[in-house]
Structures are given as C-alpha cells and as structure tokens.
A protein has these predicted regions:
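Residues forming anionic-ligand binding surfaces in small-molecule and nucleic-acid pockets
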Residues: 84-90, 94, 106-121, 218-239
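Phosphate/diphosphate-binding glycine-rich loops and adjacent basic-rich segments that engage nucleotide
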Residues: 158-230
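Active-site cofactor/substrate anionic-group-binding motifs, chiefly glycine-
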Residues: 58-112
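Secondary-shell segments that build the walls of catalytic and ion/ligand-binding clefts
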Residues: 198, 208-271
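Acidic, glycine/proline-rich low-complexity segments that act as flexible tails and inter-domain linkers
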Residues: 2-19, 23-43, 48-49, 56-74, ...
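Catalytic-core signal marking the mid-to-C-terminal active-site face
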Residues: 2-25, 259, 264, 269-368
Length: 368
C-alpha cells in the first residue's frame, strides 16, 4: 500500500487509545456475540492493526459491520468451515457464512503449507464475508518468507465503465514481497475502485468532500442513517469515469478479481449483490496465495536486486514540492511506529458508535 502522508494525518476530534486496550475491548465485544476466544482475538488484531497502520477505513470503523451482521445471523459466529485440496497446490475452503477474517486466516495457512512443500499454494474461499484489509494477509505470508497474494470480491459498490449501477465490489488486491533483512519490503494493497468504500465514508464523517473521481457524478455521495455510504452513490473504478483516464482498466481488474474469487470458488454473483445491504449472507469470496521466493533464484539474490531497484527509484527526479518518493508500504510502517508509541487515533464519531455497542453488549467502553 502507499498513501503518502495520509497515513500520518489525524482527525482533529480524535482520542488516542493504546493498542492493547483497543484489542481487548474489541475482542470482548465479539466474544459476547459467541465468537470463540481465538477468533475474537484475531478479529481484534486485524481491525485495530488497520488503525495502527493508518488505514482508518478498515479499522475500528468496521466493527459495527460485523456486529450488526452477527446480530442478524447473516454472519455465523461458529461456522462449519470445510477445506479440500484437489491438487497439491490448490484448495477450496468453504467458510460457512462465517467471519471472513477467520476464513482468510485458515486459507492463508493452508496456502503457505502447500508452498512449503511444493513451491506455491493457492486457496479460494467461498461463502465468506469481509476479510479486513487485504494487505494483512499478504503480509502474513511475507513475514513467513513467502511472496504473499490476497484478493477479495465484495458486495456491489462500483459501477462498471459506461454503467451507473453499483454492481461490482471494490475488489482489493494485495501483494507483499520480503526484502533484505533490515531493508525494505514491498507491500502493495489497493482497491480496484479509485478508493475503498471506507475512505469515502471516512471523508464524509470528517466533513471533507470526496475528491472528484471517487464517486460517480449521478448522485452526490452521502451517508445513510447508519453512517454507511448510500447505495445510490456508486464508486468509480480505478481510473475514473469512461475510458479517457483508464477507467476501463480498473473495471477490468475488478472483474478479474470477481472471477478469481467468485466464479472459481462457486460463490454466486447475484447473492453477493443482494448481500451488500446486510440483510442476507454477504456471499463473498477470497483468493489467498503463497509463493516461495527461492523457487526462482536464491532468495538473497532476489532481495539484493529488489533493494537496488528501490534505490534507483528513490534517487530518481522528484515532482516539484516533493521531498521523497515512497516505496509501497513505507507510509504505513511509519504510521505504525508512531501509533504504537502514542496510541491509535479514533475519531469521536467512531467512538460514539463503539460506545453504543459497548452498552448494548455489556462490555467496557473505549477509554477517554
């Protein structure tokens, strides 16, 4: 992922909360909803970890998404998860309408186990739900020494090129490649829409007007009564409207992810569109991949070439007013270092939502 200084920007009305405190409270909320302890801790780790890295669109702001759907029963706290591997390097995991974060964890573990013995492993997940920010899973593989790949489809939010209906998801793609020890890792995490839904919601919550090119021009973007982006405000594919600025390329990437995560695993497209509103199972699918770096060349040689590439890019000419060229993942790593020391910044509107859930569930609220 690369977000420049955005990962360091903090809303003025934010409260700083220590990571361990936030994780404990969030995990407690999910345990009350009958999510097993280990799974609740994993969910809390990912959601708080997103805020830790400055990815506010996928952090504590997503807690109500899960709790609401667990409460309605469209996401199951204790699903029947099944896995089968038709070949030594491919597998299919049936998530049983459970929490996507839990299913993705199992799938990436299976992919890495395949890669350890056969050089690579890919697992498709079906009948799942939101799996957090895609980079979390690619990074998990990277931390174990593999090239990590993760992607997911999602409910209809993005209009195809020349269309106005929000029929495709934001369908993120993440790739993480381990660099030299103590050097720079490569960590790309991107939506195939111009931005993720959560980024538009974050901007609107903070009183900012989303930049042109984020949302279609038919309806001005606005939040509904639950603080969620209205479905009559479809996002644009990466590249924007039409073909002049490459919108058809973002549309193509989104459709590619849809096919790899949906058709490949057998999760129905129509069911996913229906599930976007939260009244039925989300019906999402994911793809997890792990590849051994030394399956091509000695790992140290690959990493040395990576570092040389990064050096040439950093040393290239910069645009006026810019003092640095980032490598994907650097801004988030720097944000994490700051937030571990100072606490994660949580805007008041998110704290208010969490307070309401804490009261309803009978758990401690976030401290002030």
């Amino acid at each position: 992922m690369i977000a420049g200084v955005e990962s360091h920007q903090v809303p003025a009305d934010s409260t700083r909360i220590q990571v361990d405190v936030a994780q404990r409270i969030v995990a407690g909320m999910f345990r009350v909803m009958e999510v097993p302890d280990e799974d609740a801790a994993l969910v809390a780790e990912l959601l708080v970890g997103a805020d830790l890295r400055g990815i506010r669109s996928h952090g504590l702001a997503r807690v109500p998404y899960f709790l609401t759907r667990l409460q309605r029963g469209v996401i199951k706290a204790r699903p029947d998860i099944r896995f089968r591997a038709p070949t030594p390097t491919t597998g299919l995991l049936e998530a049983g309408d459970g929490i996507g974060i839990v299913a993705a964890s199992r799938a990436m573990d299976e992919a890495m186990a395949m890669a350890a013995g056969h050089g690579c492993g890919f697992v498709v997940v079906k009948d799942s739900s939101h799996f957090g920010y895609a980079g979390f899973w690619a990074e998990r593989a990277m931390r174990s020494g593999y090239i990590g790949i993760s992607m997911s489809n999602s409910g209809g939010r993005v209009a195809p090129t020349f269309g106005t209906a929000p029929i495709l998801g934001t369908n993120p793609i993440a790739v993480a490649i381990p660099g030299t020890p103590g050097g720079t890792d490569f960590h790309l995490d991107m939506a195939t829409s111009t931005v993720a839904v959560g980024k538009v919601e974050t901007a609107l919550r903070e009183g900012r007007t989303p930049p042109r090119g984020w949302v279609g021009s038919t309806h001005p973007p606005h939040l509904d009564d639950n603080g969620v982006l209205s479905f009559d405000s479809p996002l644009l594919p990466l590249g924007g409207e039409g073909t002049e600025t490459g919108g058809h390329k973002g549309y193509g990437l989104a459709l590619m992810v849809e096919l790899l995560c949906g058709a490949l695993g057998g999760t129905g497209f129509e069911a996913r569109i229906a599930g976007a509103a939260g009244e039925s199972a989300p019906a999402m699918g994911h793809l997890m991949g792990a590849i051994r770096v030394d399956g091509f060349r000695p790992q140290d040689e690959v990493q040395s070439d990576m570092e040389a590439t990064f050096g040439l890019i950093r040393g290239s000419a910069r645009a006026p007013g810019q003092d640095r060229i980032y490598i994907h993942g650097e801004p988030e790593a720097e944000a994490e270092a700051i937030h571990r020391q100072e606490g994660i910044p949580v805007p008041s509107v998110i704290l208010e939502q969490l307070d309401r859930w804490a009261t309803a569930l009978g758990v401690e609220p976030m401290p002030r």
